[in-house]
Amino acid sequence: MPILEKVPPKMPVQASSCEEVLDLPKLPVPPLQQTLATYLQCMQHLVPEEQFRKSQAIVKRFGAPGGLGETLQEKLLERQEKTANWVSEYWLNDMYLNNRLALPVNSSPAVIFARQHFQDTNDQLRFAASLISGVLSYKALLDSQSIPTDWAKGQLSGQPLCMKQYYRLFSSYRLPGHTQDTLVAQKSSIMPEPEHVIVACCNQFFVLDVVINFRRLSEGDLFTQLRKIVKMASNEDERLPPIGLLTSDGRSEWAKARTVLLKDSTNRDSLDMIERCICLVCLDGPGTGDLSDTHRALQLLHGGGCSLNGANRWYDKSLQFVVGRDGTCGVVCEHSPFDGIVLVQCTEHLLKHMMTGNKKLVRVDSVSELPAPRRLRWKCSPETQGHLASSAEKLQRIVKNLDFIVYKFDNYGKTFIKKQKCSPDGFIQVALQLAYYRLYQRLVPTYESASIRRFQEGRVDNIRSATPEALAFVQAMTDHKAAVLASEKLQLLQRAIQAQTEYTVMAITGMAIDNHLLALRELARDLCKEPPEMFMDETYLMSNRFILSTSQVPTTMEMFCCYGPVVPNGYGACYNPHAEAITFCISSFHGCKETSSVEFAEAVGASLVDMRDLCSSRQPADSKPPTAKERARGPSQAKQS
């Protein structure tokens, strides 16, 4: 086993030393009148004229001199002085902890690795052992504060970014609550650092100690222990109920079930071991047999339900690494502690570790007999059995309701877009708007996450991609009666991309509207007896129903990210631009008759082809003209991965 230096537990303040060294600025508070004007500009073209006039009057009263808006703005400026980040608590509660929906599909994204080709169970376990070894190496970097600082890329590149999210990767747990969850972090200087991983196998949970006598287990030792776990899990006489199913339920239902579990000391001990672990490793059985990108992603998003691997999970833990017998591998993320880019950075580090091997560690002979991993025990009352049956039924509903496709658009990628002197992200966002307009003849409030990690404790704000300029472009592209010239369409496209880019810069510099309005709304809860009309207005409520929830999650290795929609009639659209292709993960719900993930993916493909055709009409040398087959094909005929 590699010999570890015994390091004293970290105090919470040490996790913030990166920010102290970087001296990151505080998140600014945007001017009130600027935010109100931008809000109206973002919504005017998305609502009926009469509704907009009513909202305009409400906003005017809210922002009037000496009015409620100015009072709340003053309170917010006071809050900015007293806190590291004035929106972080409000944002975390609103985005995650207050949400009562089940975590699978609704909240927890997944990263899917390249398919592995395991010949047998031993291959599967070797991969898992190597992955755990990589986790321990990465955690050692975090514990010693040795992880290099991230620097901004893309718009306004070259600025250092807040690193606090990295220190939550292996130390966070989302505790269910009856009305609000709690994000728990292991910050104690008294309790020892966790030195165990929880392994899920056959819906059973096992404690795998990864440090014994101050020595970290080698990959060989980890492999040996994993083989023991698989053997123990295969003993049907010892099998216990699939308690992990409870974590897939609605948050209030799981909180109630957990309260019942806690009445028994055996259950309390088992819950404590899970809640304090470094991470979960889920050794899955085979899935549906379909190993396409789409079906492997579904195994990560919901496990295929209780009949497959859906109960072989513990959704409250921030990182669950899935290693399936059929080669389906990836990670399921409880999203509240950190953002997608942090997850990707961690995951890419692990995969590189697995590819290269860590030769720097000093190897010593394994102890003669490693203590056997421990199965977590559960005492299930009739009430708990009822909770399990209900959870299983609801998970099956989630599985059946998800309409999901991985679509690889391979006609071109970001190389072509950059040749047009366009932002790839802005270009793709406009394509998404065009796709939606083609299907529904309207634009809708759109969410695109924008990192605000340039500031202390920064997470994200929203880029509102459904701009007036995007509407002008998509109308020109779809109005066949108007006979708009190609040169005019091209000019409208450039304006739409420019508007998207300008809003992006506004968001990443802390000047977007969503976090600001959220903070004003939350401050009003404490200050006002009744909710202000500003935040009860239909236009404001509509502005927060994101029918298009989008995110660019680029990777340098073969993997992709996916998630579900955030409203019943919406789409999730996660995309990964490559040099010569773009991978899209499109999600919606079968329960909504208006939506179809395949149709939306086809519309995205057609929009991208038409936009290339439009650009190529000006610069034919930059790209070969699309063939008739390319123009017509969608994901059903092209690469539906």
Swiss-Prot record:
Superkingdom of source: Eukaryota
Catalytic residue positions: 335
E.C. designation(s): 2.3.1.6
Catalytic function, reaction form: choline + acetyl-CoA = acetylcholine + CoA
Alphabetical list of Pfam families matching this protein: Carn_acyltransf
InterPro entries: Carn_acyl_trans, CAT-like_dom_sf, Cho/carn_acyl_trans, Cho/carn_acyl_trans_2
GO cellular component term of the entry, any: neuronal cell body
Keyword Heme attached: no
Broadest EC class assigned to this enzyme: transferase
Residues with the Phosphoserine modification: 17, 366
GO molecular function, one term: choline O-acetyltransferase activity
Record region (Disordered): 615-641
Keywords: Acyltransferase, Neurotransmitter biosynthesis, Phosphoprotein, Transferase
Biological processes per GO annotation: adult walking behavior; chemical synaptic transmission; dendrite development; establishment of synaptic specificity at neuromuscular junction; muscle organ development; neuromuscular synaptic transmission; neuron differentiation; rhythmic behavior
PANTHER family linked: CARNITINE O-ACYLTRANSFERASE, CHOLINE O-ACETYLTRANSFERASE
Family to which the UniProt record says this protein belongs: Belongs to the carnitine/choline acetyltransferase family.
Function: Catalyzes the reversible synthesis of acetylcholine (ACh) from acetyl CoA and choline at cholinergic synapses.
Protein name as it appears in the record: Choline O-acetyltransferase
Underlying gene: Chat
